[in-house]
Regions:
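Conserved acidic residues
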Residues: 108
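A conserved beta-strand element that flanks and buttresses the S-adenosyl-L-methionine
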Residues: 111-112
């Protein structure tokens, strides 16, 4: 999959941020209680479901899914976060870019929590098609984006924000994926509750 130099520069800058700040990022996320959303996703899956944690960060969600008995593949683009997540979860976390996902109908669920938001809309559209291909029929995707209409660099990373309406517009021609639930939450990290997030659950039909 080919992307222009501008897009790759944005990806490189975001990965550089996470590699340089991996330890502080991990410290700020692994202890955050996120079970309400995790369980909302798991309720959609069978007990023997195969999950892809797509952009696993420090491994908080992978560790929770494993503790609940699910089979999990965990990937991230940051070499340093992969190292931290491997140690934290006890499984091998694979370093890869979102654009490199090439599985076919392998997963019952794809968990993309605050991860694919670092892609531009152009990149996101192609990656979304790869996610769809990697998902089994009737499979589920959970994903989240910062709530808003901004797209560009912010705090050293690239972000694409969505509202409920702009995400519907973005996905309207992706036949076969249906938004089943969407809701807005505050940030669960201490001192950041005023930041709003768009949460989405979609099913492959």
């Amino acid at each position: 999959m080919a992307f222009g130099s501008k897009y790759m520069a944005d990806i490189d800058k975001t990965l550089k941020y996470y590699n340089e700040n991996a330890q502080s990022f991990a410290s700020g996320t692994v202890s955050v209680k996120f079970t309400e959303v995790q369980d909302k996703f798991l309720e959609k899956l069978n007990p023997d479901a195969y999950i892809l944690d797509f952009g696993c960060g420090a491994g908080r969600d992978t560790k929770y899914f494993l503790s609940r008995g699910y089979q999990v593949d965990a990937v991230d683009g940051s070499e340093q976060l992969c190292r931290i997540a491997s140690e934290y979860t006890g499984i091998k976390v694979r370093q890869m870019l979102f654009q490199e996902l090439d599985e076919k109908e392998k997963y019952d669920g794809i968990w993309a929590c605050a991860s694919i938001l670092h892609l531009s809309k152009k990149q996101l559209r192609e990656v979304w098609e790869n996610m769809y291909a990697a998902l089994k029929l009737e499979g589920w995707i959970y994903t989240s984006f910062k709530y808003g209409e901004f797209e560009g660099e912010r705090n050293g990373r690239y972000f694409t924000d969505f509202t409920t309406d702009t995400f519907k517009d973005f996905i309207h021609d992706m036949h076969g994926l249906k938004i089943e639930e969407q809701w807005i939450t505050g940030d669960v990290r201490p001192g950041r509750g005023e930041e709003k997030w768009l949460n989405l659950l979609l099913q492959k039909k």
